[in-house]
Each structure stands twice: as C-alpha cells, then as structure tokens.
Amino acid sequence: MVIMIGKWIPLERVLRFPEVTPEQVTAALQQCVDQVRNNLPAFEAKFPAANSEHNFYTPGPNTDWTPGFWTGEVWLAYENAKNDSDRFLFRKAGDCQVDSFLKRINIKHYVDHHDMGFLYIPSCVAAYKLTGSVSAREAALKAANQLITRYRPIGE
C-alpha cells in the first residue's frame, strides 16, 4: 500500500529529502513574492513570451497559450503578500491582466484550442476566488463556454 501526502505525492518520495523548516519555507515564499514584484515593471500590463531569447522573456501581448501562468503567479503573490503596499501592486497588475483576458475571450483571439485552462484558471478563476471580480468571473465563464464547444461525443 502506498501512503500519499495529498493526492499526488507518495510519502516515500518526501522522505528522501531533508526536512525543511517553516522558516526556510517562509523565506522561499517571500523570495518568490519579491521576484514577482521585481518583474512587475516589465509585465504589469504585458506577458512573458512563451519561450526565452538568450534567457530573457520579452514582454508582449496576451496572444499565446502561456500568459495565464504569469497572471497566476501575480495572484499567488497577491495572496501571500505581507503588506498592503504589495497587495495593492499585485491587485492592480492582476486586475489589468484580467481585463486583457476578458478582451481576448470577447474578441475570440486564439481561443479555439485545448489550452484554455492554462489561460483562464490561474488568471481569471483565481482572481474571482480571491477578489470576487465580476470581470474575472465573466471571462472565466466565457472561456469555459468556448472550451465546451470543442467537445465531440464520438471524437474526431
């Protein structure tokens, strides 16, 4: 019998690693929040490209399959921010990005594919759960409705 931690992690795999202290976890999480904050000037209203050029992700529009990941990081930083100033910055960026996702689904720009979850769950679903944003909810529901159009009962 395999003992699991949560749904996905076998206990035996966890036992192979040294114990991590709560302080180390807290410091690592703060480092992540700091890195997202440091990247906001380049990516507040833009999104990292799907792949790097010379180890640098250039800012660009919400047109590919990966922008939801960055916005998800912004919402995780918002959720874990230690002060109101950071929370304000992350909320402002997250709301701006949600507007971009709503616009994208409204004009149906590159949304007829299976990556809709990558786009809209970490961005708009997260925003709605954290803030109650009406725009985020609208975008997420429209994305879900778009995704369901891909269903084929027999498959093709």
Question: Could you say what each language-model-derived stretch is?
Answer:
Residues 1-156:
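Glycan-recognition and catalytic cores of secretory/periplasmic carbohydrate-active enzymes
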